[in-house]
Amino acid sequence: MASWEKEKELAHLHQPEDDPLPDLSLLLDMDQFEPTEGPDSNPGAEKIYLQLQVAPGDPSEKTYKFGYEDKEAQNPDLKMRNWVPDPEKMSKWACARLILCGLYNAKKAKELLKMDYDIHWEQSKEDSQYFEIEYHCKMCMTVIHEPMPVSYDKKTGLWIKMGPLRGDIGSVVHTCRRHYERCMSALPSSGEPLKPRVRANPVRRYREKSLIVADRPKRSRWGVAPREQPNTSSGDAMALMPGPCGPFNMDPPGCLLERVPGSEPGTSEMALAMSGGPFWEQVYRDSISGPPTGPSEN
């Protein structure tokens, strides 16, 4: 068989996504190479030899290099991991602090920074406008996910939260503090570290929460839910309004004492009525007008 016929048979081994080969003759007689030969003498094993070398650096940086770098090279508008909006004016150090100040107040952001977590942000798969934050523990490599997504506002140059539902979504500060204290106090262990509870995608979870909050009935100004009767015996809302019998008046409730006999302060009838009545005073010999007169065992 001629050499060109052999090359034609071996052409199906070369895939379009592979590196272009200047000459298919390199694929001829590949089975004759010894497995112990180095990359210089074996052209087919050079690429595998480079991949098997242990690259120095942080594991998260390796993940970015082999998992995100190719995707970003294919689409220049796609910024997936640790995206810095303006590299000329901002660094990753400053960008992480602006993200924390957008998520929390300055006191909580300072607390998160003092705990020395590796902060990473990744573009959301649900909506490319938002980014999801991760806190990587340096002592046990545990990953804690931030429940609130953030987005970058190009007009103001700030990172902002997805919405105002911080109370419904929850905070990650307490979880990070508890995990940090546990790692600092625990002895070194070879076992697998404790993982936080797995939550749903932050963007999708926030949208579902916003629908629940939108359907929730809002309370009125005076503390009564709409379309509900006030909690009074007669069903009259007068007790919730400002007036002589309402809770917003500082005057003595004279209208409540009109039906009490001898309602003037300091009278014996008033003292008897407030002490429990004649039966109470007759049996227990107790009255607010003076000390109890009965024995202690009664």
Curated annotation (Swiss-Prot):
**Region described as Transactivation domain:** 225-298
Q: Where is the composition biased (Basic and acidic residues)?
A: 1-17
Q: Which GO terms describe its cellular component?
A: host cell nucleus
An example Pfam family from this entry, by short name, is Foamy_BEL
Q: Which GO biological process annotations does it have?
A: positive regulation of DNA-templated transcription; viral process
- Listed InterPro entries: Foamy_BEL
Question: What keywords is this UniProt entry annotated with?
Answer: Activator, DNA-binding, Host nucleus, Transcription, Transcription regulation
Q: What is this protein called?
A: Protein Bel-1
Species whose genome carries this gene: Simian foamy virus type 3 (strain LK3) (SFVagm)
Chain's gene name: bel1
